[in-house]
Amino acid sequence: DALRRFHEMPMPTHWAPEGINDLDFDKIRYYLAHGTAPYKSWEDVPDDVKRTFERLGVPEQERAFLAGVDAQYDSETAYNNMREELSKQGVIFVNSTEGLREYEHIFRPWFGKVIPVNDNKFSALNHAAFSGGSFIYVPKGVKLSQPLQAYFRINSESMGQFERTLIIADEGAELMYMEGCTAPKYDSATLHSGVVELVALKGAKIQYVTVQNWATNVYNLVIQRGLAMEDAEIRWIDCNIGSGLTMKYPAVVLQGRRARGEVISISLAHSGQLQDTGARMIHAAPETTSNIVAKSISIGEGRASYRGEVNVLKGMKGCKNNTECDALLINATSRTDTYPAISVNGNASAVQHEASVSQVDEEMLFYMQQRGLTRAQAMSLAVNGFINDLVKEFPMEYSVELRRLIDLEMEDSIG
């Protein structure tokens, strides 16, 4: 049924970037396993897979500051482990396939409820082809002091990765989940089309952090949506640096009174890249609050677009939204676009949207170069200053990595 829906539903060409039409679904491999199993011990992971994740620093980070790790290699989870004390508290952290099989009574009621199969063409594709991803359940009142983390690696040519992540925070529970995404570059197109569903029950808090650094041959077409019940909070902290085309709009449906939603977004588009990112906030209950802060950087002929939706449903009162959208153009050929959609159908609500576009000041760069910095160093300093207030929202380990990646992009752009 899901595959039939995928074939019947049209591509979102009425608003999506033109580059999406170049994707040939017939040339994508929809499942590729390497004989791996979700090992619980790092020593048991096959050597070739282990070497890949060791270069990414997975075992060191797990020992240093993580409560649990899930590492996916192409279509399947290669490694999954969680600290023993969390298991004793009833926390579940497994791959989604195992979650469906072993914890069906928790998994099944919410699977596909936040993002149904008929939501759009790519949700149907994910329903038909999904494998891997994370399933997390945090019991009532349990608050995790350390983050859980997942790594997604596409290591093969012409691959399609269709992980499915479902995170449920029971009443009063709190957690942070972080994911990193990487892939080597190939000449042929690769597709990443994951689905993420978050459920924050009464008074729960979920923070979902992403640093995406796919290779530029990757189409990054993902759907991420959270459901926040009464007094719950969902925060998406999102950074997109890689992929040739990204379409990504984290959303929060504010379903319960006094629910809160936030999206913090950083996008960087180099020549040959289009970062079409943004956020959606649906105020479906009174006295709900949302905040969107998005910053984009366009380098060379890179293009970054902000696409956002804020919708206060009919009859909702006392809702508040703040949206800030800032773009920085590095070169005269760089491009940015903003497509806000705001709909307020209730009374006594406040919605505000601010947007700005600026260019790097040549006089400022000249001044810094006179103080001994190279042009690349001066440019990195200017860019890091532009996004500094958002980078501070990322966990320490990710913020350091993020600054390093941006420095590398600046060096490559100047040569």
Go through the PLM ranges and name each one.
Residues 1-119, 123-124, 293-296:
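N-terminal amphipathic, basic helical "cap/leader" segment at the start of enzyme domains
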Residues 79-373, 387-415:
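Conserved beta-strand/loop scaffold segments within soluble protein domains that form the structured core
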